[in-house]
Amino acid sequence: MAIVIVGAGTAGVNAAFWLRQYGYKGGIRLLSRESVTPYQRPPLSKAFLTSETAESAIPLKPESFYTNNNISISLNTQIVSIDVGRKVVAAKDGEEYAYEKLILATGASARRLTCEGSELSGVCYLRSMEDAKNLRRKLVESASVVVLGGGVIGLEVASAAVGIGRRVTVIEAAPRVMARVVTPAAANLVRARLEAEGVGFKLNAKLTSIKGRNGHVNQCVLESGEKIQADLIIVGIGAIPELELATEAALEVSNGVVVDDQMRTSDTSIYAIGDCALARNLFFGTMVRLETIHNAVTQAQIVASSICGTSTPAPTPPRFWSDLKGMTLQGLGALKDYDKLVVAINNETVELEVLAYKQERLIATETINLPKRQGALGGSIKLPD
């Protein structure tokens, strides 16, 4: 019997790493539906898109990590069911893998468009390395690029595309970009910087249809009636947690697989971590599903400590980062229910610091191009009493 980990992204690979760090001696099997060794996903929406030399993404761990730590990894292995009674997962090819403990690190998939024309050639999504390779090829062939969604991923892709001379328009349904992630001050500075680089923005704008020519996208039609030329449409409108396995196994699910503070699901032999998990976050003070590297690594460490019976790591504030056309954007803490913002901005140097307070307690920070300052602020964010 072994610990089986379904999903070999950041959460899954780090779970295997921490299990060995905490002294687990049994078998560990990583199951990945992809065809390549586990890799880092953040660069896919940044430098990888415009690189002329990178043939593959940066590995999460060197191949020697898996052999040296006696971690078995199976590629091209799509798990389709869990038999909780027999403690077995079954792959699409019929192969079965028995588990003592099962860790679901299945991640999330891109939210798909459903409007007229959404199936035309030239409508692209970005989640995997294959997606990134396909998108990189299409960027070379395209003059006019429309990015649907003004979140972090959408703006990273827009930044990369305008950097290689493409005409780029971002369509966002909200009144501002990154509305769910950062304060208006940070959003406005990012938007102004990208506009100066040539990125166009359509805010409060809703896509109603996509028109094509000879089976390929040609233009986007907005609710206002405006039509925008598009040789390539990149969709970044959020992600949906992969819940099929958990649902089929009758685990409790909501906007994610529901887990306790030890990452256990409603079946105590099964855990869930990373983008697919809905967990209580002490800094947010509620159940949340976070799609960040920090969250994936943190939950991987928690699940390993739980299985190995070691003390649970002390909670650390949520964090994220992004690179956007000469801007390093960093966020720390839970930007929620604040009652005071202290903003310092330098438009000439493109630097920003935002401190968010709740009842005089610092709960979150944002910085642009101030990495040392962000690092210094990290220890100032404490859990509520």
From Swiss-Prot:
FAD binds at residues 8-11, 32-33, 79, 156, 275, 293. GO terms for biological process: alkane catabolic process. One of its GO terms (molecular function) is oxidoreductase activity, acting on NAD(P)H. Its EC number is 1.18.1.1. Pathway: Hydrocarbon metabolism; alkane degradation. Keywords: Cytoplasm, FAD, Flavoprotein, NAD, Oxidoreductase. It catalyses: 2 reduced [rubredoxin] + NAD(+) + H(+) = 2 oxidized [rubredoxin] + NADH. The keyword Metal-binding does not apply. It is found in: Cytoplasm. Its cofactor is FAD. Signal peptide: none annotated. InterPro entries: FAD-oxidoreductase/Apoptosis (IPR050446), FAD/NAD-bd_sf (IPR036188), FAD/NAD-binding_dom (IPR023753), FAD/NAD-linked_Rdtase_dimer_sf (IPR016156), Reductase_C (IPR028202). One of its GO terms (cellular component) is cytoplasm. Homodimer. Involved in the hydrocarbon hydroxylating system, which transfers electrons from NADH to rubredoxin reductase and then through rubredoxin to alkane 1 monooxygenase. PANTHER family: APOPTOSIS-INDUCING FACTOR 1, RIESKE DOMAIN-CONTAINING PROTEIN-RELATED. Belongs to the FAD-dependent oxidoreductase family. This is Rubredoxin-NAD(+) reductase. The gene is alkT.
